Amino acid sequence: QENMNTKVRGKKDLENLSVPCLGEIPLYLSNKKKNNKSPEHVIVVEESNRNIINEAFRVLRSNVDFIKNKNTQQKVFVVTSFNPGSGKSFLSMNIAMSFAIKGKKVLVIDGDLRHGTVSAYVGSPKKGLSDYLGYEETSWNELLITDKKYPNLHTIPVGTIPPNPTELLEDKSLATLIQALRNEYDYIFIDCPPIDIVADAQIIEQYADRTFFVVRAGLLDCSLLSELENIYQEKRFKNLSIILNGTESTGGRYSYRYGYSYGYHNGYASYCRDKK
């Protein structure tokens, strides 16, 4: 119990960072017996649902929208973290769904060629990104998995789990692919491996516009926050911002509402000004 006190618990633990925080997603606990899916493989965002987690994703969507409206060329977002199990894939798929519901054309790329967690959402198809990067015999259009309910939401899975993921990502065909996709989509989210394990996220990030860094409450040790601040100050990742995931909601209140919940303009924008 004592060592749990060293973990990030909520927004208060991030107050000393100058890294902007885009949003806070409350802990999602699924009824596993009911749907036979782990919490990591569930789409919780629904068009007319007004529960706490859907409201949290709407706030996050508004904040991402505000960023993009300031620079319409910014449409490729890398999602990474320090730890495995931070909920990157869960966030990537649900943020994407929140934009698809608004009628935006959205793509999620599974950039974790080692585990393919996003791919599990769409049945882990045998053909995907690794096959394209390795051979380029396939058109990227053939890799797309289209959502059954929202035809404007697509996923590119990993496909074959390769023995040499880093080498594949360093191939020039990745840059060519992302450039082509920019012309087709409003938003592109790339789920990447944690940065402390392999170099893959840094390789992919050079083709992206912004980095969403997932901090999982109850998982990330507070001692790593200074490292996150260093990464931000040294600009090792472009336009880094935090998404806090898995916070405990208290007393039925919207625990993620901290300062900018009623509109990005009133909160996040002024938050950025304060940090300058």
Q: Over which residues does each language-model region extend?
A:
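Short boundary/hinge segments that flank catalytic cores
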Residues: Q1-K105, G111-S119, S124-S130, N141, ...
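Conserved Walker-type P-loop NTP-binding/catalytic site
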Residues: S130-A180
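Well-ordered beta-strand positions
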Residues: Y187, R210-F213, S241
